[in-house]
Amino acid sequence: RQLPELNIFISIKFNSNNMSTIHIGIIREGKTPPDFRVPLSPAQCQQLEKQYPNVKVTVQTSPIRCFSDAQYTEIGLSVQEDLSHCDLLLGVKEVPKAQLIAHKTYLFFSHTFKKQPYNRALLQEILDKKIRLIDYEVLKDANNKRIIGFGRYAGVVGAYNAFLTYGLKTGAYSIKPAHLCSDRKEVEAELKKVVLPPDFKLVLTGYGRVGNGAREIVKLLPIKEVDPDTYLHEQHNEAVFTHLDTHQYFCRKTDAGFDKSEFYTQPELY
């Protein structure tokens, strides 16, 4: 598939206008607990080099990445520990302070944009090392919509692991944790093992990325969707769920009304 967001990476202007080759490094995720994800798959790296002949991708060696080092080397990519020659370094989650290379350009989710106090020291280290940070969270298109976000898969994985936990609690079935599934196909195969009692009831809230991601998982299961009134007031002889929008589980304290714009700007009224 096409990767239009890669144009953003390549369009970044570096300090040297005479640079004939742009070196992009794929860093090893360093957070604890370990994160298996990677910003670009082997196929995407290959596509990137093909689309932009002046781009060379180097992958930092990793024993835990969802794609093995061999999968990158097999298609001709360089896999090594040292990425100090790279102009642009791509990761997924926060980079440990000790692993930050001074005077480089990084792309990753830093979780500092909202002034998160737990990453204040990370942001200070970035400033001290004169690093240019491009945070995926703030990359937007011409319509001011985010280009990159993991909300959907947060919903997918969260819902999957909720059913994993339900199986552990009841002993009715057993499925492997989401992070041990190799792909979406295996996730769906595992879900076929789920067995639910006829009195099982579930409520989904919200139609954002996370809510819709969770809905994807629920719709794969033998659970009938019903409207909220039916859910509350009728008897059911099968597993059911209902999906609530914001106005269905929040109301104004004074008159039980709802105004969406007011709710988001003055949530304390609800």
Task: Give each language-model segment a name.
Residues H23, K97-F200:
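Glycine/serine-rich phosphate-binding loop and adjoining beta1-alpha1 elements at the start
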Residues R1-N18:
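Short, Lys/Arg-enriched N-terminal segments with co-localized hydrophobic residues
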Residues G25, G76, G155, G206-G211:
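Glycine-centered flexibility sites
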Residues Q46-E49, V79-E81, S110-F113, D128-I131, ...:
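Short, surface-exposed linear patches
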Residues V79, Y106, L133, A239-H243:
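Conserved beta-strand scaffold positions in the cores of enzyme catalytic domains, especially
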Residues P34-Y52, K56-V59, P177-Y270:
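Glycine-rich phosphate/diphosphate-binding loop of Rossmann-like nucleotide-binding domains
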Residues S20-E125:
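An N-terminal-biased, well-structured beta-alpha scaffold segment characteristic
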